[in-house]
Amino acid sequence: YVATVFTTHATVTGRCVAGNGLPLYKDLGRLNAGELARQFNVVAKHSIEKIASQEHDVFCTVSEITARECESLLGSTVDVVTPNGFEDDFVWNGREFDEKRAEARRAMIRTAEATLSCKFDGEPLIVGTSGRYEFRNKGIDIFLDALKQLAETDALDREVLVYITVPSATTGPRKDLQAHLADENSPIDPKQNRFCTHYLEHPEWDQILNSIAGSVLANPSSKVKVVFVPTYLNGRDGIFDKSYYELLVGMDMTLFPSYYEPWGYTPLESTAFSVPTLTTTLAGFGLWAGSQGEHEGVTLVARNDDNYAEAAREIAKALLHFTKYTPQEVEIARNAAAELSRTALWSELYAAYEKAYSEAIERSVTRTNRAVLNDGGGTTEQINFVRQQLITEKPHWNRVMVEKVLPKRLHALEVLSHNLWWSWTSGARDLFEYIDQKLWSECEKNPIVFLDRLPLERLQELEQDGSFLAMLDGVYAMFNEYMSEKPDPKAPTIAYFSMEYGLHSSLKI
């Protein structure tokens, strides 16, 4: 037998509610998860989560706040809370750490001065945030509002450099910025958005840039400077060419004021690099850090459904307070952050998983309806129970499969529908749209389903449609030419893996 453990790191319905600006927490006990799943078109995902949470030996999640969410939205009580741990073997030590930090600071200051066309008077306080581009869930909205309040504070007497490293839809690094970083005599293009390091596909709709535009953060004389890096920092971004960790190590403080955050690896990673961080009481990590007592390395801001303005003020206040730190106070906060991170190592947190696995094994024995007979000696025997099957008089249902048969003249349609070649060939797509555009849309552009639903009368019409047949013959000839090409045995083999996107919408994942 196999013991089963289901661990969820969020609920799809909860994430949808939070991400769409609806209150999640104060109405949690009254939310109708099934109806919400239908509204947000996530019925399948919600159903899988709900069934998985019920058909388990042990049900786990990563934080107490998500445990309450699961109980309300999935209807299942969490058996064991299993906080996320990590290994610190990716963190540099000693001299290498200091060199990496100094190098990161130089790179971030130099890039900001080039992007913003400014010059820092002294050493700025470098703060940052990162993660998925979920404007409300990740607290990017409240972070920007707090920065605006900070920028308008007369008590701010130090420049603050803010990096928002959140991947978005980009078309590559800015060429003018690349050229200027390679040669300072190369000019910066004034037509480009000066807050962004990369070209965005739709900058006019970007929530971060729109929040900055027209605010005090857009004022060149503001002491708070914001740079948006909308790409993955994987060492090949074209501007920094450094990994996320290679920039994180150079920051003075990070902020992750999330509204929806079942755990939150980003603030934990921050503490691992001795960077003090700010999080909230709506984040799993924030609640866990708060349970460790008062801590100089982590600032915890209270958030709920009704205190947005108050929380924004607290975040601005925490930032202002940090700008006033003496070098000794900064060192204390950095050491405290590193110390806290060591309590989140897997060696400290794995016990919760061991508990979950042990309970799962015990429950699976009961679930399998097996008994162990012991003869009192050293021999045991496992017996499978076989229950008596009651036979009742009832009708037997047999499944009958009815397969369509296309007219011979239209057989090419059948062939085309079973090869994804049609999905990237406009002529092939036009064929199916020509037949019945409305039905094509109703079938979600799935040619196999589409042909199954075509009425016989329409097929007979197509057999006599000269224009359509000429189009079909042309496309089919292109397809046969494509299929006749012999693959190059020396060509690279490509495999496609994605948890979110299929090759085509008709190919479900």
Predicted regions and their residues:
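Catalytic cores of nucleotide-sugar-dependent glycosyltransferases that transfer UDP/GDP/TDP-activated
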Residues: 1-509
